[in-house]
Amino acid sequence: MPESKYRQQTIRAPRGTVLTAKSWLTEAPLRMLMNNLDPDVAENPHELVVYGGIGRAARNWECYDAIVDALTRLEADETLLIQSGKPVGVFKTHDNAPRVLIANSNLVPHWATWEHFNELDAKGLAMYGQMTAGSWIYIGSQGIVQGTYETFVEAGRQHYNGTLAGRWVLTAGLGGMGGAQPLAATLAGACSLTIECQQSRIDFRLRTRYVDEQAATLDDALARITRYTREGKAVSVALCANAADILPELVNRGVRPDLVTDQTSAHDPLHGYLPSGWRWEEYQKNAQSDPHGTMQAAKRSMAAHVRAMLAFSKMGVPTFDYGNNIRQMAKEMGVENAFDFPGFVPAYIRPLFCRGIGPFRWVALSGDPQDIYKTDAKVKEIVAEDKHLHHWLDMARERIHFQGLPARICWVGLEWRQKLGLAFNEMVRCGEVSAPIVIGRDHLDSGSVASPNRETEAMRDGSDAVSDWPLLNALLNTASGATWVSLHHGGGVGMGFSQHAGMVIVCDGTDEAAARIRRVLHNDPATGVMRHADAGYDLAVECAVEQGLNLPMVAATQGKG
């Protein structure tokens, strides 16, 4: 690890209303950058790693310092450009332009491989931004809890008559993303057994109440699961072991879970998936000394893992990929039928995307949890009829531990995002909350990503790999006046397999902010409806007509349907 990528320093975002930068529009990205590296948020903050293998917030510590300095000095009509975690320029733009534009990990397609990226990374020329690590809007595991919860609930609807009570989920991975799984299963009414190879991650999830219990052995874990499912209790159990060993063993024993998925960091075989029989320290050492051999060893273990998932699927157990590209890795190692079980988006989530419904999130820059609780109440007031959403907000308040600055996520669609943003802005203006609020989202959204093995898998018109859509999303959010906009490559599924865009907008209580919110929080989800309508989804066409979208090649939106 080059010296500049390691620093023994604790970073925490400022709280309260005293500004470090010149305005809230530059204070917000500054605080959110720092929040991504808060030790309560980031997986490895001393190496700038936020989550997802090597998903970083800045390329190295010199770049981090330069970004902080640039943001503190940035004027109201200037825009800072970030190239793979490095601040490369400040340009005069205008008041309604984004204050920061970010491009992370983007490579010309022919060279878009982990091998080439790792060479660039070693030379200090690139940075893997994951999705919300390099775009400074990660909020800890809460950021994926509701999406995972919605997935499990929909699986219960489809396979188990609408309930997961008395059922159990088998999965693996308790990192920044995977750590959401046990809590999401509990909230959905199911027991869960999550395999994790690092004890430190289990300890963190136990401490933050994302996991209820740890089993000492596989037999102990199965005994607990049997007892809790028989009693109808939703309890999450973690086991420190390697999934590539445990899943085949469960198949051999004839154990039958009720749902099977996986959220290990399989997208990154060099840093994110421990080969069977290896210790973590050995894995890290070999990643430096023999990267090719290490990647092959990891992928061989992934192949064993996927063969076990295929066996569960053949038993009739609902089995799905949760977006980490493990099927692709297994296929590259000779598992030709790796894609015989589906990804979670085509299986459970796409109808939501057709209506622009996705991971709307917001953060209280004040650091005061009461500001989030007040916005929770505002969401219930505005989206008054959605009892499912109200139930989520109640459960989130009860069970979800804030990591860093207080934040909330809830999945809402095109119909509601603009209304909620304007309401939050008014709360800031009236002093109902104590400081501005930032609104952002995961790049995993309906119109902001092209990822043929995840979000755009099995599109109706075959356009899975067309990546014009996230580029258009980023361009439109820039034109609409988002506070910062990001365009990344490789998030979630690794190099060569995705392109995706993000946006964040600040609610500072001003009329100017309201105008930007009105544009951004309509246009951003509208691109998702547009993308799915263009692909021929009737639900998306209906939503486009309801919301008055003008889509020239979709006849129904032109009064010709």
Curated annotation (Swiss-Prot):
Associated pathway: Amino-acid degradation; L-histidine degradation into L-glutamate; N-formimidoyl-L-glutamate from L-histidine: step 2/3
Instruction: Keyword check for GTP-binding, yes or no.
Output: no
Q: Which InterPro entries match?
A: Urocanase, Urocanase-like, Urocanase_C, Urocanase_central_sf, Urocanase_CS, Urocanase_N, Urocanase_Rossmann-like, Urocanase_sf
| Cell compartment(s), UniProt | Cytoplasm
An example GO BP is:
L-histidine catabolic process to glutamate and formate
Catalytic center at which residues? 410
Q: What EC number(s) has UniProt assigned to this enzyme?
A: 4.2.1.49
Which major enzyme category is it?
lyase
GO MF annotation terms: urocanate hydratase activity
Q: Which cofactor does it need?
A: NAD(+)
Keywords of this entry = Cytoplasm, Histidine metabolism, Lyase, NAD
In terms of PANTHER family, this protein maps to: UROCANATE HYDRATASE
This chain belongs to which protein, by name? Urocanate hydratase
Gene encoding this chain?
hutU
